[in-house]
């Protein structure tokens, strides 16, 4: 079983293959920036963290913006993709502190956090629940994650925004060699030297009549050893993803959006992911196909004698 230790505001995980830290206060959700270490190659994540949670949105066509919390668009950061906030604030920067539970199984440890949004815009009410479960197994260079939303509103197209696998900070491409988008292919780091809007290049928007075979997004980390593994996030059911960005705005922005479908008060939506290091695209595809179609994770038992299963 991986080792787990709570130290102040952080949960430290160490397995035979990786190390990771979860921050429960400050900049929260997902795995902390720079803490996900691949013990085989020495690679670390290069961004603001992995599986980082934001807020709830909806398409804005034909709807007025909330004057007190307008969604900005028409710039390099957001392009001309019109959205409107439904519930706020942004979890990663504004929640400040997340309740958590730690679970221990025979060959894994898991951490579950949650947050209830306290603010809503215009016609909506606050109270939607976000739950995130991170499962860290022994013997693998990846972990399994799930985000689940329980809506407090009726909405024609409710969207949950997150970073998947996570934004990529770099200095003129020195830290990474390539981006990989399964629905597009490999893209050299040289394409990300100057800022461009999300709707200029590499924008994914779901077409239910032509879903991609896999939804894998990530980057190849340059290492001193030259082994250069891929760090990717795999959303295991492509139908769960409504939109995904991959653009440069001072860093490579890996925004991903889930849902985008009609939902009623009390209903749930979300996705499940594999996030980790791989030596090749073939290796990614092999693991993806092992778990293909999964959309959630559930914990069973108590915190000392736990099993987990796909939801």
What are these regions (language model features)?
Residues 3-6, 93-95, 127-129:
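Short solvent-exposed loop/turn micro-motifs enriched in small/polar/acidic residues
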